[in-house]
Structure formats: C-alpha cells, structure tokens
Amino acid sequence: MVSTLAEPSPQPYPASGRGGSLVGRRVSRMNGAGNKILVLDLRGGVDLPTPAEGRAIHRAPGLDYDQLMALSDPQSAGTLAYVTIYNNDGSLAGACGNGTRCVADRLARETGADSLVVETAAGLIACERLGPWTYRVDMGAPRLGWNEIPLAHAVADTRKVEVPLDGAPEIGPASVVNMGNPHAVFFVDDVAGIDLERWGPRYEIHPLFPEKANISFAEVKSQDRIALRVWERGVGATLACGSAACATLVSAARLGLTERAARIELPGGELSIDWLGDNRVLMTGPVEFEREVVVEADVFGASG
C-alpha cells in the first residue's frame, strides 16, 4: 500500500530524511513531458533500493514509474546530490533527461537556486531553471564511436548501421549514439505507422547491442522539427525519453537531415534540443509535480 498526500504544501517536497529504510519514505511523483518519474530522496545514508525493491515499487498502486531517480549524498564538490537511475524492471540507467529535470526542480525548490549540478553514473549534469516549471539540462557530449555505444563489433560509420531483423519492415539503417545510454535511431517516413510494441522490444535485445539499446523511430518534419516514438531499454514504450530526443537530434544533424537545433515532438509533449558547437547537447523541457506518496511496508512483501 501507499498513502497519498493529496494536498502538498506550497513547498511540495519533503525535507531530506536521515537514516532508516525505504519504508515510510516520501516519494515525489512527477512527470517530464509525460515521462513518469519518481524522485526518492535517500540523502543521509539510506541504502539504495535493490533491483527487486525497484521492481516492487513500480508494481505498487500509485508508484508505477518509467524511471526512479534515487537521490544520495553528493560524491563530488559543487554537486547537490548523486542520482542513481532505475528503470522500472529494476535495471540501472546511466542517464534520464526528463528525470533529471524533475530532480532539478526538486532541488531548486529546496535550495532556491536557479542553477545547480547533480551527478549520475554518466557524469556531472548542470541544470538551469528557466521558468516556474521549465528547465534546461546539459546532457554532455554524445559518444559516437562504435565501441562507445557499445556495439558488438566494429562498424565503419555509426551514422548508418545495418540492424538485420527477420520479418522487420524495410526501414533502413540505424544511427547509433550514446547519450549516457545506448540509442539506435531509425528514420522513417511515417512514425505513426510503426508497430512500436512489436518491433521495439526485438530491436532492444538485438545481438548488435551487448548492453541492449533504447530504440527510437523518428520522422523528420522540417529542418527544425522531428516526430519521435521511443521504446526504452528496461521500460518499454514511453510517452517521452529525453536522452532519446538528444540522440535523435544528434543523429539527424550528423546525417544532414536537420540543423543542430530542433523541437522534438513526443507523445507526451515537446522538448527543445540544441547540439552546441562545443559538442554539448542541451535539452529544455517542462516538469510537472503530481503528488507525494509514502512507501509502506507491504510494498516489499513480495518483491522479486
């Protein structure tokens, strides 16, 4: 069971706890462009969830998520928290752009800062508040080498990689990018016509991707607008994926399909992506606070 705190205070986030277990912890339920995010504050020495606990949290009523952002004490000077990112199958992710914006909102409202830095497995991430519910996140530089994605074998050009799959529609090669997570982007004429639930999971586990991959299908509508649908590694079909939006813009620009800045249309909303001349990728988009919930003991009664 979870207890819903229906009426958050003007400061709608709990103060950092100190010690104890996950039971009784308050969780901020948020979304970034439709991406379902939980922000769990474990600063003060509380142990991180195990993979089984991560799955159990997702199965609990009111706590289902695409990504769980677990905040721990900072490990590097100048940062406010170390963020461990869980997919809803209990696996870990290196980056989550939409979730990072939600974390930035949580910490900005806590500290009053408009600019802040957090740390993830992918490195330091600078965040900036642009408006009451709008944030820009520096997603860093894309990694483009075949061994950085990683792929199972060397390829001559990561802009165009054949990913053969029996029975799959003729959609051409993928462009592969690592934006903290491995991504494969297929550019198609009609993104709405792709059977995402059928082909997404099959491409995700293709032998070419030893760490699996996030699979995106993108339709370029103009030099500055792309429609996108995403099958997220360890999650499934989602309404939005920030790192996939970044990977898609980088891929489109490398192929000469767009400029280095574009609006990415996702089922849950829009994100603005800019690939700067110094190679950094900036993502700008909305966040929404939904409610707080409390993790109760029976959430973990049958975790596995």
Spans of model-derived segments:
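Ligand-binding beta-strand-loop-alpha-helix segment within the catalytic cores
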Residues: 143-145
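Internal active-site segments that recognize and position negatively charged phosphoryl groups
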Residues: 159-193
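Low-complexity, intrinsically disordered or signal/transmembrane-proximal segments
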Residues: 11-13
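Intrinsically disordered, low-complexity regions enriched in acidic/Ser/Thr/Pro/Gln residues
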Residues: 135-137
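Short, conserved active-site entrance elements at the starts or edges of catalytic domains
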Residues: 152-162, 201-209
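A glycine-rich beta-to-alpha transition motif near the start of alpha/beta enzyme domains, typified by
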Residues: 2-7, 20-133, 184-304
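Segments forming oxygen-rich coordination pockets for charged ligands
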Residues: 140
